[in-house]
Amino acid sequence: MNKINEKRKSLINIGSATVYIEIFVLSAILLGASLFFLKDYDAYRAIFLIRIILIAVAALSLIKWAKLKRAEALLSYDSYDGGIGLEVANKLMDRAHIDDGDKVLDVGAGSGLLSIAIAGRFKGSKVVMFDYVNNDDEIIAAREGRLTEEEIRNVSRRSGKFLPLPFENGEFDVVVSGFSLHTDKDNRDKSVLIREALRPLKKGGRFALMDILNEAHGFKDIDNMLYELENNVVSEISTEYMFRDLEEAEEFKKAGIRDARLIYGVK
């Protein structure tokens, strides 16, 4: 997985230089063209040519900017790959109390970091990576690259919508999710997704769900929802903020993650 991120870093570094080179070259062409064509009787040609070149500069710069932003976003998404990601994955696994041989559902697997971490540690377990149908091609490519690179065999893939999940009641021993539910595109109130994520969990099964649990990310009345879950759905539930100290909080904020909370317990 480090190779994947190194490639993205290279794209960002090389791409940034390329943008400046392209702008410089096209600007030089623009200047040269204006000097060559700028004559009274041909002023309209100069203006027309300048407009065409400006449009080309803008279009090429915009395309390159979009590619760079995408690479930066994926790198940030998988900065999860090292410090933050490894710590988050380990904490989720620890709180979920996974046993070797468990059937585990990862809701919103994304690029597969959490699923692959679980499958690598618990080689006797079966891990189902579930994510959006028609998810981003680059995220899918990153996921497949990880599976190949890590030589993971005990993982299967499913896709669909989060509501409802395409699984039977009580199908899994463990349900986990890492920073995924808030990205759901189909439901304004993301709180209902937590309840749905617990539906395929067996009675007595363990869960650990981490997300950005605030109203800005679609989670409404989260405390009331947790109270309702504790009294009607699960037998044990705990919650904790991910920030142990100010330094860690800053690291999460750099990765675009605020109000990160972990919900875990037993159904």
Label for each model-derived stretch:
Residues L163-V175:
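A short acidic, Gly/Pro-enriched loop at the edge of an enzyme's catalytic core
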Residues D245-K267:
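Core SAM-dependent methyltransferase catalytic element
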Residues A117-L163:
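Class I SAM-dependent methyltransferase SAM/SAH-binding core
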Residues G101-G110:
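Conserved class I S-adenosyl-L-methionine
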Residues S191-K203:
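A short glycine-rich, Lys/Arg-flanked "PGG" loop and its adjoining helix->strand segment in the class I
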Residues G204-D211:
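Conserved beta-strand signature within the Rossmann-like core of class I S-adenosyl-L-methionine
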Residues A66-N90:
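Class I SAM-dependent methyltransferase Rossmann-like catalytic core
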Residues G112-I116:
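Glycine-rich SAM-binding Motif I of class I
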